[in-house]
Amino acid sequence: KTRQSGLIPCDFFGITTGYIGRVSGVENHVITHGPSAFACRNNALADMACQQDGFEHAVLDAITFYGADRIAVVVGTSTSGILSAENAYLDVDAQTGCPPRTFHQSGTQDLFSLTRFLAERLGTNGPLLTVSNACASSSRAFVDARHWLEAGLCDAVIVGGADSLCRMTLRGFASLGLVSDGPTRPCDEARNGISVGEAAGFVLLEREGARPQVPALA
């Protein structure tokens, strides 16, 4: 009604094509849980999401009820922490061609980084799975999470996803001619492209009625 938008003109890495959905404060967010090797933009987004809506406390209650070994993590991501790798490649040693020693590939760029970070961040010890199939990653994660519950592999699943802004995504979609010059208008007859954004979100998926004292939200 107020015609306010979360999209702003792209100001990332000198890229001026289109508009972006940029999460405020993520650059200054400090991850205080888990090894420092997990420090990257994508995991910072995930950490911020864990602090919303009492989610981390809900997971702790589930761990108390089921046990840490029975809580799985199934999440989707298409880019993971690739921004850290992009920055590392821009700062390779001129003599050796090696990236900086501060670059931790397994904790940032690796697609399993997000999943491992969440397990350590939230204290779970059950099965882990990362789904990465482009824009459908998090949707597919919900499908796999339900299958795991039905198969009895776990009693609860942390499911969702995170994707963060990076050069590859911004320049990639622009090179395909898919980025709108202005804020995207997906249902408008005159729509002319997309706007790239970043976000993270998670839910705790359980079997219906497993904990009668906990109200079902969906």
Question: Language-model features: where?
Answer:
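Active-site nucleophile and cofactor-binding loops and adjacent substrate-binding regions
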Residues: F12-G14, N43-A49, H104-F112, L129-S137, ...
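Condensing-enzyme catalytic core mediating Claisen C-C bond formation in acyl metabolism
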Residues: K1-Y19, P183-A218
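Conserved active-site "lid/cap" helical segment
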Residues: K1-G76, G81-S84
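Active-site-proximal alpha-helical scaffold in enzymes
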Residues: V59, L111-T115, A119-G161, S195-P212
